[in-house]
């Protein structure tokens, strides 16, 4: 398919030409030309009338299959452009949905794409009905008013059915998530702008040699892998990539997938460090906006600057500094900003940061464990090592073990005959209250 792309930039809306061209290529289009204009939005055509005439001439000369706008078009603008150009018109979000449709493999992903597409169609169908009533016989996809009204009813019915199916998927996922939490797994969500290298990072964390494609939106299906961080068991989940100005109808349609971020213990926000700072800044802010909409900004967030193998060390350090500075300016609390190369497996800074953050989670606590019977020490130590991290051991008439332990395992340790108390900030033990929420197995 051959397309002409159109970008309109203004003081309020700055769009990346490089990103738009990458979207077009990802959707499989041969880009014949890109038409650009700097002006505020024209209410009738989005671009100005003069630029529209230029576009008409290009369409006659190049004979594309479609004209695709980098901007969001109103239904009225899309119709007016079609009437002038007599060629299929698409906007940014139709283009994204087309890519999503190509990438969706699981039943859930296909349902989410269909839901988003139907939500996008509703205002277009309503505009078609309005125009029919004004005497314009264009209709929607050649349909008359009655057929268009019936199609609108069908859309709403189908959306209801899809939402019901997605709710069932969500319930099943919640059951699995609870089982994982109860089994002591720490849940980490990989989030970030599309094509930042999240899938490559997931493979590196899980030590899997699976090729990750260098293209936009390779991940629509939720993918989870497990790995160990010392004694800690981690489940990392790759999520659908963000894009600048992600509209509410796409966020809503993909909520069951994006919910993995909301339910995670830690959010790992991946950025491509090889890009110019202006692009990193734009994508970082766009990612933060999606996290804000998901109400996930209060989660522990680690920013991973990926692809450092492609830049100089001084450049990487400067970008780390700028990320910290930008986060402070925006009032965003970050746990850490680390440099990684997922492709080369250079993850040392990330693993150190994850280890520190995991031990600060509510599901972990610092405890002093007293074992009075020497023969029970090996079994208690083995249990602690399987669900936590030993800080120090003092052997004597009583064995004293200071350790980070999953709080849900306190009851199991007590059942082995050990005494346990929480460590305060000075390293002294404090007796646990009965109502502190720890099960003793009874």
Curated annotation (Swiss-Prot):
It holds the Pfam family GTP-bdg_M. It comes from the Archaea. PANTHER family: GTP-BINDING PROTEIN HFLX (PTHR10229), GTPASE HFLX (PTHR10229:SF8). Residues 186-362 form the Hflx-type G domain. Its cofactor is Mg(2+). The keyword Metal-binding applies. GO terms for molecular function: GTP binding; GTPase activity; metal ion binding; ribosome binding. Monomer. Associates with the 50S ribosomal subunit. It is found in: Cytoplasm. HAMAP family: GTPase_HflX. GTP binds at residues 192-199, 217-221, 238-241, 306-309, 341-343. The gene is hflX. This is GTPase HflX.
């Amino acid at each position: 398919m051959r397309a002409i792309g159109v970008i309109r930039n203004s003081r309020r809306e700055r769009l990346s030409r490089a990103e738009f061209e990458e979207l077009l290529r990802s959707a499989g289009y041969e880009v014949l030309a890109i038409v650009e204009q700097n002006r505020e939005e024209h209410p009738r055509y989005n671009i100005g009338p003069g630029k529209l005439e230029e576009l008409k001439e290009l369409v006659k000369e190049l004979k594309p299959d479609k004209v695709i706008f980098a901007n969001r078009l109103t239904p009225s603008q899309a119709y007016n452009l079609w009437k002038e150009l007599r060629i299929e018109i698409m906007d940014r979000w139709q283009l994204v949905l087309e890519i999503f449709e190509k990438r969706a493999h699981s039943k859930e992903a296909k349902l989410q794409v269909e839901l988003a597409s139907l939500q996008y169609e509703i205002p277009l169908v309503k505009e078609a009905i309005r125009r029919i009533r004004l005497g314009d016989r264009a209709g929607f996809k050649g349909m008359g008013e009655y057929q268009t009204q019936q199609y609108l009813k069908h859309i709403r019915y189908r959306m209801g059915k899809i939402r019901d199916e997605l709710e069932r998927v969500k319930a099943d996922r919640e059951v699995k998530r609870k089982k994982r939490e109860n089994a002591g797994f720490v849940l980490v969500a990989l989030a970030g702008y599309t094509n930042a290298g999240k899938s490559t990072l997931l493979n590196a964390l899980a030590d899997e040699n699976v090729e990750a494609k260098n293209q936009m939106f390779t991940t629509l299906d939720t993918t989870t892998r497990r790995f160990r961080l010392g004694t800690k068991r981690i489940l990392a989940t790759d999520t659908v990539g963000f894009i600048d100005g992600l509209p509410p109808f796409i966020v809503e349609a993909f909520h069951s997938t994006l919910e993995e971020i909301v339910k995670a213990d830690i959010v790992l926000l991946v950025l491509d460090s090889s890009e110019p700072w202006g692009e990193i800044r734009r994508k970082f802010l766009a990612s933060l906006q999606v996290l804000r909409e998901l109400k996930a900004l209060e989660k522990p967030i680690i920013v991973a600057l990926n692809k450092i193998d492609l830049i100089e060390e001084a450049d990487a350090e400067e970008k780390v500094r700028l990320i910290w500075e930008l986060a402070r300016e925006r009032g965003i609390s970050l746990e850490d900003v680390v440099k990684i190369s997922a492709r080369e497996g250079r993850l040392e800074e990330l693993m150190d940061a994850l280890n520190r953050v995991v031990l600060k989670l509510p599901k972990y606590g610092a405890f002093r464990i007293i074992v009075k019977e020497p023969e029970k020490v090996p079994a208690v130590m083995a249990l602690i090592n399987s669900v936590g991290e030993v800080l120090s051991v003092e052997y004597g008439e009583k064995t004293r073990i200071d350790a980070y332990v999953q709080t849900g395992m306190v009851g199991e340790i007590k059942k082995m005959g050990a005494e346990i108390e929480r460590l305060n900030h000075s390293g002294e033990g404090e007796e646990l209250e009965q109502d502190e929420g720890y099960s003793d197995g009874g």
